[in-house]
């Protein structure tokens, strides 16, 4: 989509047509402005907790002449919204733990939301587990390469489904089912990060004898099994 890099274009692709969108973490309001310019959304509220990005987003919206379609608010996550204002939420470019906290803290607002579009920077397994534990499921996922990095984008919809096994929470259940071209690179990256964490424990005999060290070894083995299909 014009004006968006590959990462944000992948996020935009999952936003439902005609959505009333909240974009948490404004980033100059790039995502809602691009969607509004294409007529893809009914309206949007861009939220940022920091004054600098908030002001930058306000300037971008004014410059684009989109103030009637895109509102910018200063606030912490979903706390800047009233229940019923939006039916879709996008959170991109934050750690999975931070996204999980934003969603957990915004339970009242999420009651009226049907779609979540999430792009976690790490800790995606924790985020996926939270979604399945809290009445959501992963409907679609994509992998995109941008700036030499791989990014995961998740589309979650309301509705409880069976929670995938831990290794698929790490990889992505839809990614595993669809096996896109970048999947092996994605799994190899996960293995590298787990190995690095385990290597950091090897200098301590107590750590090597602990349950956490063994659990990381089991996680590596489970991921390596998924490299063969």
Q: What does each model-identified segment do?
A:
Residues 167-229:
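An accessory alpha-helical subdomain
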Residues 1-18, 33, 55-84:
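S-adenosyl-L-methionine
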Residues 28-41:
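Conserved SAM-binding loop of SAM-dependent methyltransferases across substrates and taxa
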Residues 43-48:
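Conserved SAM-binding motif I beta-strand of class I
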Residues 50-52:
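Conserved SAM/SAH-binding beta-strand->alpha-helix loop
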Residues 105-155:
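C-terminal substrate-binding/active-site "lid" region of AdoMet-derived donor-dependent transferases
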Residues 18-27:
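Conserved class I S-adenosyl-L-methionine
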